[in-house]
């Protein structure tokens, strides 16, 4: 374990040896209590509610600069992490703020249905609905509709990859760039790093429990859709260019590298950085550490380049 990450990593492993459905629910309550006190500085936060097909409401947070630029900027769909089973958009406010302060972009972040409430495809459907809403409201949000980005970390990174595959196949909305940060991609857990991993924050036992909840009756089935587990994808063509980073002692290390390398083999620009001795979510738990600061510096550099160079027009509406 990297010396800069060791102390908090050791404490985290002691506090939560593994996540179960019970601990997912418990920590989700804590997260929601803490974030209710969060008041973002230097950015504006709004809330909209979208009508789901089942007549329930999807809560979506919109984050934007307090003083918008005159010109239009990229629009980002940000998907929070939490093993598909916990969390909310507000937990990532500091990362979201970094993107906004970088170039004045607008970030749309759905409070998607957690797997403790409904299994796949509920979360995917929510995130896709939010992406379509971002496309349809680009003008109102001062967003370039040819620069829609999708990003997220952990389970949010997995959903980022899922949404980009789903959008490619549905052909209803174009995504210009994706950032699936240390993503949760493979339900099969067949890679070396995903097996017998007792790393801090997220380990093999937690991973198994989360996938069971997320997939429900699909768990351990051979025909799990690629939209649920993107590592099962075979056709990587026409996916958006991508960037990610990942630690090499966490469960998602191998599946992240494999996914990015397969994109590169398909001719998709895909850059990634591996951090030696870094565990899952190190950039959040040890945000002040040298590896974390470096990871976010490189992340923002890639985001800046994408903002300057990557565009993809929306398909004509039928």
Pin down the residues of each PLM region:
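An N-terminal hydrophobic leader/cap segment in hydrolases
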Residues: 2-49
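Alpha/beta-hydrolase superfamily serine-hydrolase fold, recognizing
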Residues: 11, 15, 44-318
């Amino acid at each position: 374990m990297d010396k800069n990450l060791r102390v908090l990593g050791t404490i985290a492993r002691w506090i939560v040896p593994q996540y179960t459905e019970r601990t997912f629910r418990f920590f989700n309550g804590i997260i929601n209590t803490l974030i209710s006190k969060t008041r973002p500085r230097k950015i504006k936060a709004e809330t909209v509610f979208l009508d789901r097909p089942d007549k329930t409401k999807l809560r979506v947070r919109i984050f934007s600069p307090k003083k918008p630029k005159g010109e239009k900027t990229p629009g980002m769909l940000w998907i929070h992490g939490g093993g598909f089973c916990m969390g909310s958009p507000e937990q990532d406010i500091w990362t979201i703020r970094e993107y906004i302060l970088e170039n004045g972009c607008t970030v749309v972040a759905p409070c998607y249905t957690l797997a403790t409430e409904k299994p796949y495809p509920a979360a995917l459907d929510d995130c896709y609905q939010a992406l379509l809403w971002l496309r349809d409201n680009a003008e109102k949000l001062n967003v370039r509709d040819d620069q829609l980005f999708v990003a997220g970390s952990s389970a949010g990174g997995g959903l980022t990859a899922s949404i980009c595959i789903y959008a490619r196949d549905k052909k209803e909305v174009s995504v210009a760039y994706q950032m699936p940060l240390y993503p949760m991609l493979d339900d099969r857990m067949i890679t070396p790093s995903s097996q017998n991993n007792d790393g801090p924050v997220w380990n093999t036992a937690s991973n198994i429990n989360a996938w069971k909840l997320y997939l429900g009756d699909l768990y351990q089935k051979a025909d799990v859709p690629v939209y649920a587990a993107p590592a099962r994808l075979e056709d990587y063509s026409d996916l958006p260019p991508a960037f990610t980073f990942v630690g090499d002692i966490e469960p998602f290390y191998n599946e992240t590298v494999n996914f990015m390398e397969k994109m590169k083999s398909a001719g998709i620009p895909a850059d990634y950085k591996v951090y030696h001795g870094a565990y899952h979510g190190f950039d959040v738990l040890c945000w002040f550490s040298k590896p974390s600061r470096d990871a976010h510096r490189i992340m923002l550099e890639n985001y800046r380049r994408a903002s300057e160079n990557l565009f993809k027009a929306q398909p004509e509406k039928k």
